[in-house]
């Protein structure tokens, strides 16, 4: 198994291909990755390290890449779930940051999980059912459990605010960024929602 690649970034492909090419000792490796990770990459030509998971298919070998061992390991757990292949695994990690995704699974937030492109209600339920206990233990071992989200309301207020903002047309990425940017002092759901809308309206 190829645990990681350490070399120079050659290219980034966006959209459906969503991948990067890394040159390691004269060999170029094409690695599929979530768009969220691609946005964090340095400029082409700069050194880069990508943590990888190899998926063996009948006709090809496919490398999937991530920004940390924890993201890679979470991807591996996701694709073990029946009906969740690598494409949906990437979609989940592109829609949510690692702490948000783990929290959504552990708290069985099916409505939030099903907002991921390609993830229906039944698949979201299956994710929560099969991974809830496993991820609760896994995140403790990875040190994720004791790392609260940077900003944002506590559950279940967070879920109410997220659903209200989604109904207003904001994307999941925009909502997560807004909630993490807000101060954490206690306040009613309505105030959290108003503050989030104010923040989002000020963004370019």
UniProtKB/Swiss-Prot annotation:
Residues covered by region (Flexible linker): 147-157
Region (Domain III): 157-204
Alphabetized GO MF terms: ATP binding; four-way junction DNA binding; four-way junction helicase activity
Region described as Domain II: 68-146
Main location: cytoplasm
GO biological process: DNA recombination; DNA repair
Region annotation Domain I: where it falls in the sequence: 1-67
Annotated compartments: Cytoplasm
Superkingdom in the source lineage: Bacteria
Pfam families in the record: HHH_5 (PF14520), RuvA_C (PF07499), RuvA_N (PF01330)
Keywords from the UniProt entry: Cytoplasm, DNA damage, DNA recombination, DNA repair, DNA-binding
GO cellular component terms listed in the entry, alphabetical order: cytoplasm; Holliday junction helicase complex; Holliday junction resolvase complex
Stored InterPro entries: DNA_helicase_Holl-junc_RuvA_I, NA-bd_OB-fold, RuvA, RuvA_2-like, RuvA_C, RuvA_C_sf
Self-association and partners: Homotetramer. Forms an RuvA(8)-RuvB(12)-Holliday junction (HJ) complex. HJ DNA is sandwiched between 2 RuvA tetramers; dsDNA enters through RuvA and exits via RuvB. An RuvB hexamer assembles on each DNA strand where it exits the tetramer. Each RuvB hexamer is contacted by two RuvA subunits (via domain III) on 2 adjacent RuvB subunits; this complex drives branch migration. In the full resolvosome a probable DNA-RuvA(4)-RuvB(12)-RuvC(2) complex forms which resolves the HJ.
Entry similarity comment: Belongs to the RuvA family.
Known function: The RuvA-RuvB-RuvC complex processes Holliday junction (HJ) DNA during genetic recombination and DNA repair, while the RuvA-RuvB complex plays an important role in the rescue of blocked DNA replication forks via replication fork reversal (RFR). RuvA specifically binds to HJ cruciform DNA, conferring on it an open structure. The RuvB hexamer acts as an ATP-dependent pump, pulling dsDNA into and through the RuvAB complex. HJ branch migration allows RuvC to scan DNA until it finds its consensus sequence, where it cleaves and resolves the cruciform DNA.
Domain writeup: Has three domains with a flexible linker between the domains II and III and assumes an 'L' shape. Domain III is highly mobile and contacts RuvB.
Protein name, UniProt field: Holliday junction branch migration complex subunit RuvA
């Amino acid at each position: 198994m190829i645990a990681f690649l350490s070399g120079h970034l050659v290219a980034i492909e966006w959209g459906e291909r969503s991948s990067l090419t890394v040159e390691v000792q004269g060999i170029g490796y094409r690695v599929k990755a979530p768009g969220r990770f691609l946005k964090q990459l340095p400029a082409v030509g700069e050194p880069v390290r990508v943590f990888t998971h190899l998926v063996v298919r009948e006709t090809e070998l496919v490398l999937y890449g991530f920004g940390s061992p924890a993201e890679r390991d979470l991807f591996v757990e996701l694709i073990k779930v029946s009906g969740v292949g690598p494409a949906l695994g990437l979609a989940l990690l592109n829609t949510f940051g690692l702490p948000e995704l783990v929290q959504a699974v552990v708290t069985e937030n099916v409505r939030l999980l099903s907002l991921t492109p390609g993830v229906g209600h039944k698949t979201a339920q299956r994710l929560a059912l099969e991974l809830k206990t496993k991820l609760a233990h896994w995140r403790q071992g990875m040190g994720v459990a004791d790392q609260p989200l940077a900003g944002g309301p506590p559950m279940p207020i967070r879920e109410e605010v997220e659903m209200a903002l989604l109904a207003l047309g904001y994307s999941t990425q925009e909502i997560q960024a807004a909630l993490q940017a807000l101060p954490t002092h206690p306040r009613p759901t309505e105030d959290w929602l108003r503050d989030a809308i104010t923040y989002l309206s000020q963004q370019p």
